[in-house]
Regions:
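PLP-dependent amino-acid enzyme catalytic core
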Residues: 1-203
């Protein structure tokens, strides 16, 4: 990619991001370095009951909460009387892709479908990509997952390569790149601009 191509895309950064999520982030600025999180959350417009219903549609959440009885007995046996917490484990592996990231992918993919986007794009090298791909498949959307996988010598990170295969198993197109800022400053913006997909990226 030429410097001019990068400049052309990054120069349209705000416009591309606005069209990829229908949010003008400037409305939420609070000073030079901060932004108004509470005001931002108001635009979600969903109650917790509605979010739970959306999650149930695609089998996200309601994961088991397991009390660790043996550990709790041990803690009580060595703690002063009346002390010693009860310890529970939340089994997020019971989510569709075996990760708590299914919860994070839930609403962006739902919003993309509700708003009529043809697909979603996310940049991630881990569990979030599989979660986005899985949710997109359930909602009938296309998905492109962009991964930073390779070092400068062309060696792929085994965990990221494996996550890429997981994304593909859910029907996503996986694009893999050498680690570097261009994935975020150019590749994602270019894809969003060219395809008109929803940006489900965390970054």
């Amino acid at each position: 990619m030429s410097n001019q191509a990068v400049s052309d895309i990054t120069g349209k950064n705000k416009d591309i991001l606005f069209h990829s999520v229908n949010i003008n982030y400037d409305e939420f600025k609070s000073g030079r370095l901060a932004w108004d999180y509470e005001k931002f959350m108001d635009i979600v417009g969903l109650s917790m009951d509605e979010i739970r219903k959306i999650a149930a549609e695609v089998y996200v959440g309601s994961t088991p909460l397991i009390e660790l009885n043996n550990i709790n007995r041990l803690v009580r046996s060595i703690s002063p009387k009346g002390k010693g917490a009860r310890i529970f484990l939340k089994d997020e592996a019971d989510n569709p892709t075996g990760s708590f990231k299914d919860r994070r992918a839930l609403l962006p993919v739902y919003e993309a479908k509700k708003s009529g986007y043809p697909g979603v794009i996310a940049s991630t090298s881990g569990n979030y990509g599989a979660a986005v791909a899985s949710q997109a498949a359930r909602r009938g959307l296309k998905a492109i997952i962009c991964q930073e996988v390779y070092d400068d010598a062309g060696n792929g990170q085994p965990e990221s390569l494996e996550k890429g295969r997981a994304c593909e198993s859910y029907g996503a197109e996986v694009q893999q790149y050498t680690v570097g800022p261009e994935v975020f400053t150019y590749v994602i913006l270019k894809l969003l601009d060219d395809l008109g997909y929803f940006s489900a990226s965390l970054y």
